[in-house]
Structure formats: C-alpha cells, structure tokens
C-alpha cells in the first residue's frame, strides 16, 4: 500500500539466540552479531522539534499482516511514533508457523531489548514513554521484556519500557 507519511528504516545489531539461557551473561557474548532493521512510522503531523512517545511493535509467527498494520496506523494517528521491528524480514524468513527454530522467541526477545536501547537516547523520542507491544510471538517478546532479570541483563542502565501491550502472547 502507498504510504503518505514519514517513515525511516533503521538498522541495528542483534543476535540469533537459541536457548533462553543464552540471553544472559557470558553465553550472550558467544552469540554472533547480525544486522537487523525496523521501520519508524511517524505521526502525520510530525514536528522534529518535539519529543514523541514511541511504541516498539513486533508481529507474530506469520510476519506483518493487514490487521497488525491497522493497529500501527491507529497508534500513529494517536500521535505515537511506531517502531515496527522486522525480525523475520531481517533474517530472510517469511513465517515460523510449523518451524519455530527459524527465528526463535529468544531472538525476538533480544531484538526488542536492543530496540529499546537503540531508541533510548534518540533525540526524537521521549524515553520516559517507550512502550513494548506485540502479537503472539511478538507478544511473547513484550512479556519477557517486562521481566526484571532480563531488563537488568540486557537494558542500558536505567532504561526500561514504560508499559507493555500483548495480544495473545505465547510462552517458552
């Protein structure tokens, strides 16, 4: 579909993580870095002199679908910047339905944490209003990013999501 508002593709570093224990400590450092991306979707009346709240959003196991994009539009229209993570497209995967090893929950959990760190010091962002949102597999990422031990292991000092919105999250 045609887009009539400001967007920005942002690349950043993440990892392909297999095994929840590999999100912590020295095990995390043994995982190779990869480059992934997300798309910033700006409000219609975006003003670069203001700081905006942001929603970091992640899709479910069938990638971004039309109903997800409808929600992203509503968020934008409510004057939020939406950072739509692209964990599948970044890794050349279309779906994990039937094969959850292509892109693991742990990888998307890590992608979301690194998204927070990426946006924390962005001058366009009000870092006291960064929210995590996700559907299914993406909801699992939001759920685990609310867990204090994970925050202490992965987030920048004092960085945290302000709130969490999950549609039918799974579990590990």
Residue ranges and their predicted role:
Residues 2-50:
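N-terminal cap/lid segment of alpha/beta-hydrolase-fold proteins
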Residues 106, 112-172:
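Primarily recognizes the serine-hydrolase "nucleophile elbow" in alpha/beta-hydrolase
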Residues 3, 49-50, 75-77, 125, ...:
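Extracellular/periplasmic catalytic domains that process cell-envelope and extracellular macromolecules
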Residues 17-18, 46, 63, 90, ...:
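Surface-exposed, flexible loop/turn segments at secondary-structure boundaries
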Residues 41, 57-58, 133, 167:
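Short hydrophobic segments within beta-strands
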Residues 26-36, 50-121:
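Serine-hydrolase catalytic machinery in alpha/beta-hydrolase-like enzymes
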């Amino acid at each position: 579909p045609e887009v009539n508002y400001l967007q920005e593709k942002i690349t950043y570093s993440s990892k392909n993580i297999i095994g929840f224990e590999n999100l912590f400590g020295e095990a995390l450092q043994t995982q190779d870095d990869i480059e992934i991306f997300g798309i910033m979707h700006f409000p219609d009346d975006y003003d670069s002199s203001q700081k905006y709240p942001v929603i970091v959003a992640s899709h479910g196991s069938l990638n971004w679908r039309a109903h997800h994009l409808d929600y992203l539009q509503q968020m934008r229209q409510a004057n939020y910047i939406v950072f739509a993570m692209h964990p599948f497209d970044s890794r050349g995967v279309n779906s994990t339905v039937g094969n959850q090893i292509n892109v693991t929950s742990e990888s998307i959990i890590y992608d979301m944490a690194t998204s927070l760190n990426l946006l924390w010091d962005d001058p366009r962002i009000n870092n006291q209003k960064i929210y995590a949102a996700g559907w299914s597999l993406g909801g699992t990422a939001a759920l685990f990013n609310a867990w204090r031990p994970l925050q202490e292991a992965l987030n920048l000092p004092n960085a945290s999501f302000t709130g969490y919105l999950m549609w039918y999250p799974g579990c590990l």
